[in-house]
Swiss-Prot record:
This is Hydrophobic protein RCI2B. The chain crosses the membrane at residues 2-22, 32-52. One of its GO terms (biological process) is response to cold. It is found in: Membrane. Keywords: Membrane, Transmembrane, Transmembrane helix. PANTHER family: HYDROPHOBIC PROTEIN RCI2 LOW TEMPERATURE AND SALT RESPONSIVE PROTEIN LTI6 -RELATED, HYDROPHOBIC PROTEIN RCI2B. Induction: By low temperature. Also promoted by abscisic acid (ABA) and dehydration but is not a general response to stress conditions. GO terms for cellular component: membrane. It comes from Arabidopsis thaliana. The keyword Manganese does not apply. Belongs to the UPF0057 (PMP3) family.
Length: 54
C-alpha cells in the first residue's frame, strides 16, 4: 500500500466523498459515494473504502 492510498483511506473515513474524489475525480464513483453518505455516514464510508482499495 502506497502513501497516497493510505491518505485516501484516512480521508475516506473522515469525509468519504473526498477520498473517492481524489482517486477518481468527479465520476460516477464520487456521486454514488456522495449519495450514500447523505443517506447515512456508514454506507458512505464502507463504499469509499471498498472503491479505494479495489
Amino acid at each position: 500500500m502506497s502513501t497516497a492510498t493510505f491518505v485516501e483511506i484516512i480521508l475516506a473515513i473522515i469525509l468519504p466523498p473526498l477520498g473517492v474524489f481524489l482517486k477518481f475525480g468527479c465520476k460516477v464513483e464520487f456521486w454514488i459515494c456522495l449519495i450514500l453518505t447523505l443517506f447515512g455516514y456508514l454506507p458512505g464510508i464502507l463504499y469509499a473504502l471498498y472503491i479505494i482499495t479495489k
